[in-house]
């Protein structure tokens, strides 16, 4: 089996600085939980934008961000914007462990997911592995829940979580604030607390603050 796989992130791990907390350990901006990191702490070999068949949605309650978590329903109609990171197999296994608040270090058998497209490690929210195919000779794997997006109530994401989603979509797909706001607002669960207008306002305000922070000081 290949020694590297594409980890297809569709949530906050699209944002590279957020992913680094999973790889090297640390607490993400706006997060409440410190992650231990992977056995192999190097960054991804490559990161590329991808579009997955299926639907992103928000449900349950995140201990890290509060608000809804992002999940992926591969059986629903639609498309999901993602960012694939080329990582080692042990890194992928350790990311999966941390998604379930477990101690990393246990290798997973990925053969069923790679061969048959899906495998279930357990009943937990991030214990279903989905292989959407291959890209440049490496399997594309992602992590999600066993249920359909219609199986449980939606829960809108927090503003902090939206900031990481937006940063990841900007880095990978080069989307504008308007494109990001329209995309997130139309994911099931998000509409319970957000509109495209309110998301754009939050992201626009953050962009202005960032610009002011990095602007060179003027002397008189």
Model-predicted regions and their roles:
Residues 2-220:
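Glycine-aromatic micro-motifs
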């Amino acid at each position: 089996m290949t020694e590297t796989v594409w980890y297809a992130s569709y949530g906050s791990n699209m944002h590279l600085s957020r992913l680094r907390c999973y790889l090297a350990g640390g607490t993400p901006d706006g997060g409440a939980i410190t992650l231990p990191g992977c056995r192999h702490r190097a960054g991804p070999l490559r990161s590329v934008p991808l579009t997955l068949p299926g639907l992103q949605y928000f449900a349950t309650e995140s201990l890290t961000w509060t608000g809804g978590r992002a999940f992926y329903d591969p059986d629903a109609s639609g498309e999901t914007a993602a960012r694939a990171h080329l990582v080692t197999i042990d890194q992928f296994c350790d990311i999966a462990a941390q998604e379930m608040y477990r101690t990393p270090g246990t290798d997973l058998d990925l053969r069923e997911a790679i061969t048959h497209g899906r495998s279930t490690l357990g009943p937990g929210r991030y214990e279903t592995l989905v292989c959407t195919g291959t890209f440049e000779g490496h399997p594309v794997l992602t992590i999600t829940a066993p249920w359909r997006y219609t199986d449980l109530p939606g829960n809108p994401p927090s503003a902090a979580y939206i900031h990481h989603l937006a940063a990841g979509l900007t880095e990978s797909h080069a989307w504008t604030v308007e494109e990001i706001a329209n995309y997130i607002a139309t994911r099931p669960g998000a509409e319970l607390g957000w509109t495209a207008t309110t998301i754009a306002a939050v992201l626009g305000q953050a962009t202005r603050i960032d610009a002011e922070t990095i602007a060179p000081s003027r002397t008189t």
